[in-house]
Amino acid sequence: MSFLCGSASTSNKPIERKIVILGDGACGKTSLLNVFTRGYFPEVYEPTVFENYIHDIFVDSKHITLSLWDTAGQEEFDRLRSLSYSDTQCIMLCFSIDSRDSLENVQNKWVGEITDHCEGVKLVLVALKCDLRNNENESNAITPNNIQQDNSVSNDNGNNINSTSNGKNLISYEEGLAMAKKIGALRYLECSAKLNKGVNEAFTEAARVALTAGPVATEVKSDSGSSCTIM
């Protein structure tokens, strides 16, 4: 039996990628993960301290095994949450459209924490609870936006999307997109876990972004002094 470093066939082996889901407490991260991985929406809010999900998807004919790390957004879990960042290829940074604090914390809190623990990691900004917008044109806006290639904002009918709060101070699509550009996110997505709208699309786009990051490599030296990169 012989081994050739880096030459083994991996055609049947899934590509492994790690994605951390980050954002304020109660913004909807766990509900998003439950709908995507288990197919159900939890009606009762239960704060998450830490949970890891493994889920297989196919993106652009590639079999990907996603390691999805749910994190607690509360300040008292800052030290524990910091353990989640190692070997991360993409972060889904979330906010809720009914909480301006959660949007402001994207820049004021989370980007700084990300820089401290995994500077340079690829970011995807995700707006949650978009079912709270009951305007038909707004609900049609639950689609991914590739920030680097398409800065236009339109609905399925080709019309400009006008933010509407129906008496509530809901965050508009345009405000979310502006924040995504400000923090250098590669994608801006909107979804509703409750209605299961845009959920699969959000994780598909995050997986695409994670693929561009490449695998985390560890260099191991042999007795002869030569090195081999283990993916």
Curated annotation (Swiss-Prot):
Residues 229-231 form a propeptide. GO terms for cellular component: cellular bud; cytosol; plasma membrane. Its main location: membrane. The keyword NAD does not apply. Residues 151-165 have a biased composition (Low complexity). PROSITE patterns: RHO. Residues 139-165 are annotated as: Disordered. Activity is positively regulated by the GTPase activating protein (GAP) RGD1. SUPFAM superfamilies: P-loop containing nucleoside triphosphate hydrolases. It is a lipid-anchor. It is found in: Cell membrane. It holds the Pfam family Ras. GTP binds at residues 23-30, 70-74, 128-131. The modification Cysteine methyl ester is found at C228. GO terms for biological process: actin filament organization; establishment or maintenance of actin cytoskeleton polarity; positive regulation of exocytosis; positive regulation of formin-nucleated actin cable assembly; regulation of actin cytoskeleton organization; signal transduction; small GTPase-mediated signal transduction. A motif (Effector region) lies at residues 45-53. Residues 139-150 have a biased composition (Polar residues). Interacts with TOS7. Present with 5910 molecules/cell in log phase SD medium. This is GTP-binding protein RHO3.
